[in-house]
Amino acid sequence: MVKAISSNLGYPRLGEKREWKRALEKFWNGAISEEELLAETKALRLHALKKQQDKGIDLIPVGDFSFYDQVLDTSVTFGIIPKRFQHDGGKVSLNTYFDIARGKSDAVASEMTKWFNTNYHYIVPELAEADPKVLDNRALYYYEEAKNELGIEGKPVLVGPVTYLKLGKGSDAESFEILLDKFIPAYIEILKELETAGATWVQIDEPYLATSFDKKEIALFEKVYKAFHDAVPNLKIELQTYFESLDYYEEVVNLPVAAVGIDFVHDHGDSIKALKAHGFPQNKYLAAGVIDGRNVWRSDLDAKLALLTDIAHYVAEDKLIVQPSNSLLHVPVTKLSEPDLDEVILGGLSFADQKLDEIAILTKALTEGAESVAAELNEAREAVKALNESSHRNNLEVQAAIANLENVRVDRELPFAERIKLQHEWLKLPLFPTTTIGSFPQSPEVRKTRADWLKGNITDAEYNAFIEKETARWIKIQEDLDIDVLVHGEFERTDMVEYFGQKLAGFQATKFGWVQSYGSRAVRPPLIYGDVAFTEEITVKESVYAQSLTKRPVKGMLTAPVTIINWSFVRDDVPESVVANQVGLALRKEVEALERNGIKVIQVDEPALREGLPLKQARWQKYLDDAVYSFKLTTASVQNDTQIHTHMCYSDFDDIIDTISALDADVISIETSRSHGEIISTFEEVTYDKEIGLGVYDIHSPRVPTVSEIQDNIRRALRAIDAKQFWINPDCGLKTRKEPETIAALQDMIKATKEVRAEYQVLEK
């Protein structure tokens, strides 16, 4: 027997039915007061803590809650507030907090980017002239709240100082250690206040440790955690890593902390190898992340128990902690909200609450013996077996098509330089052609009509008539704005991935499988539970209708395989590359159907390509090769005069520019406005031979850009990109924006474009 401890690393903020999102948006819209927002979110927070307590979790995280983002929380804790928000130096108000994330009329929002290789976004700290001081010990507040309200001796959670600073901008390698030295005393102040309040454990997240970095940077962690240990020697610090294995395992496990949290799920088997090769300090706790915190499939508890038993051989008898691989922020709350799912699929699922059950079962099995949870282990065993052996996962036609891939063409017939001439001949677009990325605002009326249709309150005919009316209205708006290449607006779609999941075999949508993407923005990733196959035309009807309304080209709009993979919960019984190729083959048929029906500009979005990169650079090439292959599998069969577009979201592109080119899309649009200078510098250093649009304004903020701001962005881009290659577009889709601000921003974009276009035409003469 092993005396094990159960733990959690973080819990979803959204609520079972997105109550958190609704509370935030009511506050932003002025429908509730700050006091009402605080009361609503406190009730959600305590409910989540009580559930974890009732499930028998020993170490319950507190302070993982946020009103927007945990990295932004760290910034406001230490007073790292950009000057443009005119902070007065005291505790940061909730309005200022939201302004940093969302922007306001006279101050643009802080940059937002992906949290490691997930679809969660964090607000990037602006570290120039940073002078950290503890303005608000949020961790202390949440610790005392849990203790006083529920009697929970919680485990406060902090973003570690090295990771926080590495995620920021405005400091270089030379100033990094100087900046770190400023933050260490501020963190110590937080830790001392927690210790004084009675905290026993503190979880400090340092996922940067799971990335690829120079070994000399280990000295940064040694400095930080020695200082922490010297200041609060009796406080048990759990140094938490996740999303990958540790390149410097020996150095990390010997840092002066009470516990080290290691990911045994997303580590490619490296963590157990390192443990066996180097052992583990007997005076430390090993917090073993064995339950997948990023996916929704039920664990093979027999295999997990065997792994934990193996791990236990290398850890002191009372120092094994059982936990998820990472915070459960990345999965929905509970599968109990999905009673209508197929029984076999439902049985194979495990959302946040069920993962806590799995942790409790494994902890009890270690402590009291497997026989004490024999029924639970058998139930899990049968559920996993039923799903794996079901017809859902054994489509022989799809498997035969995958086996025949070597006979499928994945290259366009003509190279770009030749086919672009054919495209220009019929498109006849002006210099700096304008377009949008795909979606237009989904008004309350759009959402209500869709909800009524789903509930059966209106007929299919009534719903389709409404979608056509809205599409026609926005085609007219685009023509009036004088946009060159139009889109149909995607009013029939709830989400750019979920919509395709509803039409392809092997996918299953959920009702309440929501996860946070950024701020109050929630997404509902489909479940890819089985073999993926094309069953019906997905986008043709809406695209053809939109094209019938205008002489201007209308883009067909699809989502590419890797983004569908990265924004779905993907089956874990086959390699993701196999699933991506199944999706690619299915979408290839949709692309061909669009072309066959007269749609000659087809956008296949790959916004999540960069975010899915493995954290270890040694694994990059295979991932990128697989991504290029599945994209070309989707697009290569079109005629030479059909123009393929693609779109990518927030990313650092300098290290994958060759991959972007290898996709062989005729036009790429990139979301860049919050980090415009960095993206432009990439194109100053490389020669990109295809056509490209760099987003000229930020759509994640309700703020309407000025014409001069857009022109500045255009002119900066044209320093690095040939005018004949350059397209002009917003950063991203406009679904989440309101109609007045959308039209106003597009008017400014078109005005800015025409003025710059005129300047260039004069120069050409």
From Swiss-Prot:
Protein name: 5-methyltetrahydropteroyltriglutamate--homocysteine methyltransferase
GO biological process, one term: methylation
UniProt-recorded Gene Ontology molecular function terms: 5-methyltetrahydropteroyltriglutamate-homocysteine S-methyltransferase activity; zinc ion binding
Source organism of this protein record: Listeria innocua serovar 6a (strain ATCC BAA-680 / CLIP 11262)
Metabolic or biological pathway, per its Swiss-Prot or TrEMBL entry: Amino-acid biosynthesis; L-methionine biosynthesis via de novo pathway; L-methionine from L-homocysteine (MetE route): step 1/1
UniProt-annotated binding residues for 5-methyltetrahydropteroyltri-L-glutamate: 18-21, 114, 567, 611
The protein's required cofactors: Zn(2+)
Amino acids binding L-homocysteine: 437-439, 490, 605
HAMAP family: Meth_synth
Function comment: Catalyzes the transfer of a methyl group from 5-methyltetrahydrofolate to homocysteine resulting in methionine formation.
Gene designation per UniProt: metE
EC code: 2.1.1.14
Domain of life of the organism encoding this protein: Bacteria
Residue ranges that the Swiss-Prot or TrEMBL entry lists as coiled coil: none
Catalytic activity: 5-methyltetrahydropteroyltri-L-glutamate + L-homocysteine = tetrahydropteroyltri-L-glutamate + L-methionine
Annotated Zn(2+) binding sites: 647, 649, 671, 732
NCBIfam families, sorted: met_syn_B12ind, PRK05222.1
Family: Belongs to the vitamin-B12 independent methionine synthase family.
InterPro entries: Cbl-indep_Met_Synth_N, Cobalamin-indep_Met_synthase, Met_Synth_C/arc, UROD/MetE-like_sf
Active site: residue positions: 700 (proton donor)
Keyword annotations of the record: Amino-acid biosynthesis, Metal-binding, Methionine biosynthesis, Methyltransferase, Repeat, Transferase, Zinc
Cofactor: record remark: Binds 1 zinc ion per subunit.
Binding residue positions for L-methionine: 437-439, 490, 605
Enzyme class at the top of the EC tree: transferase
